[in-house]
Regions:
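Positively charged n-region of N-terminal signal peptides that target proteins for export
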Residues: 1-5
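Bacterial N-terminal signal peptides
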Residues: 7-18
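Propeptide-to-catalytic entry region of secreted or membrane-anchored zinc metalloproteases
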Residues: 21-110
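Structural recognition of the beta-strand scaffold that forms the well-ordered cores
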Residues: 31-34, 117-121, 146, 162
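Solvent-exposed loop/turn segments at secondary-structure junctions
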Residues: 37-41, 76-79, 123-128, 152, ...
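Short, polar loop/linker segments at the starts of domains and inter-domain junctions
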Residues: 44-51, 133-135, 194-197
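Catalytic zinc-binding patch centered on the HExxH motif and its immediate surroundings
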Residues: 100-113, 122-140
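The catalytic-center signature of Zn2+-dependent metalloproteases
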Residues: 138-213
Length: 213
């Protein structure tokens, strides 16, 4: 059965986060700032990276041959304790984007930053819509996203939106069993995760990152 929805929202100017200045000598790096919600305190950064980010990072390396840095940041009042349950998912994303932008402006710009993404990790779904649950939300080609740990594919799905991947170009593959690529909007319980993007979305991501260099 279909178990989840992953909406992508159009990027608005008021929620755009600017990437830091890159010097000519710096190595361009894609930086993912990961903010585990305070409710995830029992999960270590190492465990989160192993379970939810390693295969995704391998996929990005394959697509773009680009250094990827994941920076876990915890216990930031106003960010990692934000209320995300019981409100509209798009409203939660707007709140998160504003909070992340405020925080980012207070931080020094890391040398070599190519692009920065800001991801809030949550334990639970964001919203129920009838028989469906919304487990993640992101601005398309934006910098802000929220992903629940309810599915191992949600992190890759939402970060994919920020890198220009789309639902329409997701597909079903076969790796010993039928599997869904990262960008499937509604997961079907009998299919596994491919832990990769479709060829079309790989091309979208590669072109997006190429334009930033």
């Amino acid at each position: 059965m279909h178990t989840s929805l992953f909406p992508a929202l159009p990027l608005t100017l008021s929620l755009t986060l600017n990437a830091p200045f890159v010097s000519a000598e710096a190595t361009p790096t894609l930086t993912i700032w990961v903010f585990p919600h305070d409710e995830l305190s029992e999960l270590s950064d190492e465990q989160l990276q192993k379970d939810y980010f390693e295969t995704w990072m391998d996929e990005i390396h394959l697509i773009a041959r680009l250094p990827v840095t994941v920076r876990f940041t915890r216990r930031i009042p106003g960010l990692t304790d934000m209320t995300y349950k019981g409100q509209n998912a798009s409203a939660a994303l707007s709140d998160w984007a504003d909070a992340a932008w405020t925080w980012r402006r207070q931080q020094p710009s890391p040398e070599g930053g190519l692009d920065n993404k800001y991801l809030l990790l949550t334990r639970d779904e964001l919203e129920r819509q009838g028989n469906h649950s919304i487990y993640g939300v992101a601005f398309q080609t934006g910098h802000s996203a929220i992903a629940s740990l309810s599915s191992y594919a949600t992190v890759g799905h939402e970060l994919g939106h920020t890198l220009s991947a789309t639902h329409e170009q997701a597909d079903i593959s076969f790796n010993g069993w039928f599997c869904e690529t990262y960008m499937f909007p509604q997961r079907f319980g009998l299919r596994s995760n491919c832990y990769r993007y479709s060829d079309e979305n790989r091309e979208n991501i590669a072109n997006y990152l190429k334009r930033l260099r």
